[in-house]
């Protein structure tokens, strides 16, 4: 194995030892059951780590990530994850979290061709086209940030319209949706736009 991979294992051992030192029995409890109250639907971007951003430990948040935090009704991966979170784990809050500086959103805004992912980014281009009247009056330097916000809102709507959430709400289950956009340059927690 390469030194870089060995370094990952070393870091994991250090992290696990620190967790056990500061929270004795943490891993025993974690091995038995997860009971998160939160689900995070976010971007795959390595700069946007769900647990670290909101200060939650493993087991406290259920996470689904993809390029540009997209939720579409044909994505069985996302829908299955949402269903598991809502029906099995009984999460109380689902946060759809976009982030400023999202490369996927930028590529969709520009209409850039990047390969297979173009098919995925088409969903964000649909958001762009649906809100063209808003984006057209925004200065060029602010369009990507605005599209990040619009995309987060549209994905919240998609989650809300899913059969999973519709059935949960019809059954009286208490699940709240939130749309957030995280700013890496702000060094702060997400600003809620519920």
Predicted regions and their residues:
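Polyanion-binding loop/helix "lid" in catalytic or ligand-binding cores
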Residues: 125-181
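A generic local structural motif
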Residues: 24-28, 80-83, 163-164
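Short HxH-centered metal-ligating active-site micro-motif
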Residues: 3, 52, 57-144, 154
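Short, conserved "active-site rim" segments that organize catalytic pockets and cofactor/ligand binding
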Residues: 1-72, 76
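Short, well-ordered beta-to-alpha junction loops that form the rim of enzyme active sites
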Residues: 43, 99-100, 180-182
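Conserved small/polar residues in nucleotide/adenosyl-binding loops
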Residues: 187-194
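Solvent-exposed alpha-helices and their adjacent loops that cap or buttress functional pockets
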Residues: 30-34, 54-56, 87-89, 167-174, ...
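Divalent metal-coordination and catalytic microenvironments
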Residues: 12, 40, 96, 179, ...
């Amino acid at each position: 194995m390469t030194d870089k991979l060995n370094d990952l294992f070393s870091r994991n051992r250090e992290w696990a030892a620190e967790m056990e030192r500061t929270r004795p029995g943490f891993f025993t409890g974690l091995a038995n059951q997860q009971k998160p109250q939160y689900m995070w639907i976010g971007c795959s971007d390595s700069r946007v780590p769900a647990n670290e951003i909101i200060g939650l430990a493993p087991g406290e948040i259920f996470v689904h990530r993809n390029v540009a935090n997209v939720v579409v009704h044909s994505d069985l991966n996302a829908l299955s994850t949402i269903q598991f979170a809502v029906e099995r784990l009984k999460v109380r809050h689902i946060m759809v979290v976009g982030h400023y500086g999202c490369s996927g959103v930028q590529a969709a805004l520009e209409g850039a061709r990047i390969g297979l992912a173009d098919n995925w980014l088409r969903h964000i281009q649909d958001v762009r086209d649906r809100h063209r009247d808003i984006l057209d009056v925004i200065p060029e330097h602010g369009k990507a940030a605005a599209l990040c916000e619009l995309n987060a809102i549209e994905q919240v709507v998609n989650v809300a319209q899913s059969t999973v959430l519709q059935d949960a709400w019809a059954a009286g289950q208490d699940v709240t949706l939130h749309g957030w956009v995280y700013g890496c340059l702000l060094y702060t927690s997400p600003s809620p736009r519920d």
